[in-house]
Amino acid sequence: MTKLIFMGTPDFSATVLKGLLEDSHYHVLAVVTQPDRAVGRKKEIKMTPVKQLALEHGLKVYQPEKLSGSSEMVELMNLGADGIVTAAFGQFLPMILINSVDFAVNVHASLLPKYRGGAPIHYAIINGDKKAGVTIMEMVKEMDAGDMIAKASTPITDADDVGTMFEKLAIIGRDLLLQTLPGYLSGKIEPQAQDDSQATFSPNISSQEEKIDWSKSARDIFNQVRGMNPWPVAHTLLDGKRFKIYAVEVVNGAGNPGEIIEKTKKALIVAANQDALSLKLVQPAGKPKMSITDFLNGLGQKLKVGDYFGK
């Protein structure tokens, strides 16, 4: 039985961890995840999905603010683990830790060398890619630059957003890891080096990138909205206040960028630089998320054709 340390944080990681826990080839000695954080409008302290799953299985959980140089890292190095598996952990692993075990592999949600970094699924959708995927790779000092053990891909449809793709890729990543890890550990699978000249990067989404630029095409804004739903969420201004947009549909229409060109009891159409967008799911400042119909029956009643978003 291979003794593992698992490192991960969100639901994506928890899916991978669950697969390892259910596979009799592996014994998870401990789990490392990000510290509990305050989330949501009420700033409630919440544990990560990985911590929740680990506690349900009685596993030892470590939550260092920074792994490098921590007492937790020293403890981890003394556990006698054979290897480390990471999946969307959210911190760099010190080389001293990687070198203390026989192997260290990462489940990365992109088709490397494309989209190294912390937001690969977001950028795949924002950029209008037709497919996304998962790469199982060796851990090295450089971010997501290790040799590739296996890859698998799946289409991105117009109905997908970050939430749906995370769910799909978590399952693909779990299955790919469990299918290929035995062959990798036995030496039957030879890792392939990445072509660094083809590498692209997907850093965490900045607050500036969350803002909708209505002078872009409707298709580009559609991809931006999907590529930020359910987090960090694309937003614009309405009457000078932040207005979040979770879902839109591209429709025919013309007007000045950001201009409301059609309003009914059930629809609000906003012009982009090319075509227009029908808003579907929104969140006005200080209010919960709501359908466009609910918005138009409430706060949105005062809006009229010729009004603008983005101001």
From Swiss-Prot:
GO molecular function, one term: methionyl-tRNA formyltransferase activity
CDD domains noted in UniProt: FMT_core_Met-tRNA-FMT_N (cd08646), Met_tRNA_FMT_C (cd08704)
Keyword line: Protein biosynthesis, Transferase
Stored InterPro entries: Fmt, Formyl_trans_C, Formyl_trans_C_sf, Formyl_transf_N, Formyl_transf_N_sf, Formyl_transferase-like_C_sf, GART_AS, Met-tRNA-FMT_C
Residues given in the record as (6S)-5,6,7,8-tetrahydrofolate binding sites: 110-113
Pfam families according to UniProt: Formyl_trans_C, Formyl_trans_N
Entry keyword annotation includes Transferase: yes
EC number: 2.1.2.9
Class in the EC hierarchy, top level: transferase
Catalytic reaction(s) noted: L-methionyl-tRNA(fMet) + (6R)-10-formyltetrahydrofolate = N-formyl-L-methionyl-tRNA(fMet) + (6S)-5,6,7,8-tetrahydrofolate + H(+)
GO CC, alphabetical: cytosol
Presence of the UniProt keyword Transcription in the record: no
Protein family according to the UniProt entry: Belongs to the Fmt family.
Matching NCBIfam families: fmt (TIGR00460)
Role played: Attaches a formyl group to the free amino group of methionyl-tRNA(fMet). The formyl group appears to play a dual role in the initiator identity of N-formylmethionyl-tRNA by promoting its recognition by IF2 and preventing the misappropriation of this tRNA by the elongation apparatus.
UniProt protein name: Methionyl-tRNA formyltransferase
Organism for this UniProt entry: Streptococcus mutans serotype c (strain ATCC 700610 / UA159)
Name of the coding gene: fmt
